[in-house]
């Protein structure tokens, strides 16, 4: 696996406020995982200092703060459900702990939306999180992994996806 880019904002220009909220949620989940910060502290920091702000010369697009909060709190509240879903969608010899923190954050946010936000179409969720993976990793293997995992989850959860359900 490759090392994620330090500045995904350079590579990712979301077309809408929800796309910006998804990217910010992935970044916040990463921060919480690596730094051990809590949900309330991280949410407050992002809303006050990051969403729609300029940081180190990068202008972060204005994000839908409500969508950001929903993804972030939804992942945290449902992580005991989400992580096994991701694990089941990986190959047998690939434990969740083997994924780097950025990739785990992307998959957790995507699985949250697929499992708990049926109002969002599957192609939108999958496409948005593939784009986020590309912002961090370029055209490496990680965006393909995000596509495969989210497609498997979509077929299992919603009966939708690109491939045929193997069951």
From Swiss-Prot:
Protein name from the UniProt record: Transcription antitermination protein NusB
Gene Ontology MF annotations: RNA binding
GO CC annotations on file: cytosol
TM segment ranges: none
Known function: Involved in transcription antitermination. Required for transcription of ribosomal RNA (rRNA) genes. Binds specifically to the boxA antiterminator sequence of the ribosomal RNA (rrn) operons.
Cited InterPro entries: NusB-like_sf, NusB_fam, NusB_RsmB_TIM44
Organism superkingdom: Bacteria
Keyword Transcription (UniProt): yes
GO biological process: DNA-templated transcription termination; transcription antitermination
Alphabetical keyword list: RNA-binding, Transcription, Transcription antitermination, Transcription regulation
The family this protein is said to belong to: Belongs to the NusB family.
RNA-binding as UniProt keyword: yes
Gene3D superfamilies hit by this protein: NusB-like
